[in-house]
Amino acid sequence: MVNLGLSRVDDAVAARHPGLEEFAACQSHAFMKGVFTFVTGTGATFGLLMFIKRKFPYPVQWSFLVSAIAGSVASYRVTSMECQKCSNLWLFLETGQLPKDISTDPHD
């Protein structure tokens, strides 16, 4: 039995897709990386804005708002890039080939 989050996948399905467990682990890692990016990005932005606030006073709710937006944007970027890597991994595990739009030539 392969676990995907809280649900279990049938053995027959797992046998047809041997890379399912690796893909699930990759997706989980990507989402946790996104959560970590949101927390650290929001905290770092808030700290920076509190430092700037000493020179240019403004209401603190703007610091919260800008920090949350910056953390969300950074988290979205990181999560989408990591999920794309997981999709490429899934295609490779299923077909044995890399997607056509990815070049493996280091000189490109």
Swiss-Prot record:
GO cellular component: membrane
Cellular localisation: Membrane
InterPro entries in alphabetical order: Tmem141 (IPR026788), Tmem141_sf (IPR038259)
Membrane topology per record: Multi-pass membrane protein
Gene3D superfamilies xrefs: Tmem141 protein family
Domain of life per record: Eukaryota
Transmembrane feature ranges: 30-52, 59-78
Family stated for the protein in its record: Belongs to the TMEM141 family.
Protein name stated in the entry: Transmembrane protein 141
Organism, as annotated: Mus musculus
Lineage: Eukaryota, Metazoa, Chordata, Craniata, Vertebrata
